[in-house]
Amino acid sequence: MKEYWEILRELREDRDLRQADIAAILGTTQQVYSRYEKGINELPVRHLKTLCMYYGVSADYVLSLNKDNKKR
């Protein structure tokens, strides 16, 4: 089972986006977002919600709670 930060990185890289691009969407800095993707800082729920809406995936998918629920 993948960690949520690994899934976030894959989602970002699959769309050829930079950490700075996602940080701007979240209203944070690239440095802070980098710490989320490395698993150093925990991702706030408000950011999880924003990213799920942006990527079109469920929170269950990002959190690896169920393999069959990529779509909301």
How does the language model describe each region?
Residues 1-14:
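A short, Lys/Arg-rich alpha-helix, primarily the initiator
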Residues 7, 18, 44-47, 58:
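Residues that mark the N-terminal boundary/hinge immediately upstream of a DNA-recognition element
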Residues 11-14, 53, 63-72:
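Short, charged recognition helix plus adjacent turn
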Residues 13, 27, 38-40, 67:
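Residue-level detection of the helix-turn-helix DNA-binding "recognition helix"
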Residues 16-35:
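Short alpha-helical DNA-recognition segment
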Residues 27, 47-61:
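DNA major-groove recognition helix of helix-turn-helix/homeodomain DNA-binding modules
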Residues 40-50, 69-71:
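Short, basic-rich loop-to-helix N-cap that marks the start of a DNA-contacting helix
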